[in-house]
C-alpha cells in the first residue's frame, strides 16, 4: 500500500518514535482511560516498527543506519515509559528515588535488548547468509565506520560500533566458536553444523522471547492495568536480568560444544 508513495522505511521509523514516546505521558496518569490509550499507542508504535521492515524488504530500501534507527526507536519508547512511571510514582509517594529505578531499568533494558538482538540475528545467520545478512563482526562494523564520511550517519554508526562491541565482550565463547568455524570453513559453514546449531539455539528461544518486545509488554500491560506500576521496575531489574543471565550461560555453554 505504501509502495510508490515516496514514504521510506526511515520515515515510518521516525513516526513510530513520536508515537511510542507519547506512551510515557499516558502512563504518567493514574487513570485507566489514559493507561489504555498508552497501551494502544505502544501497540501501534510496534505495528509501525513492523511496517518499516516490511516496506524495506518490498522497496529494497535498506541501510545499516535504518537498522540502527529501528533499534533506537524501541529504546526511546521504553525510556519514555520508565520516566513516566518515575514521575507518577514520585508524585504519589513524594520521593525522587524512583528515578534511580528508572535509570537501572533503562540500563537493564539496553543490555537485554542488545544481547537478545545478537542471539536472534546469529540464529538467522545459521539459517542462511541471506537471512543473517545483518549479522556483522566487530571488524566489519569498525571498517564500515572508518570509511564513512563525517556526518549524522557516521555518528549513528559510532554508536552502533559500541553496541556491537558490547555484544562481542559479553559473549567470549561465542566469539571463539565463530573464529574457529571461519578458520576451518570460511563463509561456507557445513549444513550439518548449521542445522545442529539452530536446533540447540531454538531451545533457548523460549527464554529469549521473554526479553523481546512481546514478552516484556504483556507483563507491563497487566501491571499498568492493575495500577501497581512500581512492580514493573522490579520485573525489569530482577526477573528479566536473571532470565538474561540464564540465557547467556546456556548460550555460551552451547557454543562451547562446537569448539571440539
Located regions from the model:
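Membrane-embedded alpha-helical segments that form the functional core of polytopic membrane enzymes
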Residues: 6-65, 82, 98-108, 233
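Select subsegments of transmembrane alpha-helices in polytopic membrane proteins
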Residues: 9-14, 70-78, 205-214
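Hydrophobic, membrane-inserted alpha-helices
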Residues: 18-24, 80-84, 215-223
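Alpha-helical transmembrane segments of multipass membrane proteins
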Residues: 23, 78, 108-113, 242-247
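Membrane-spanning helices that line or support transport/gating and their immediate boundary helices
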Residues: 50, 54, 58, 114-126
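Juxtamembrane helix-capping/reentrant segments at transmembrane boundaries
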Residues: 56, 60-74, 132-136
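Alpha-helical transmembrane segments
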Residues: 86, 90-123
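C-terminal membrane-associated helical module and adjoining short loops/tails
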Residues: 121-260
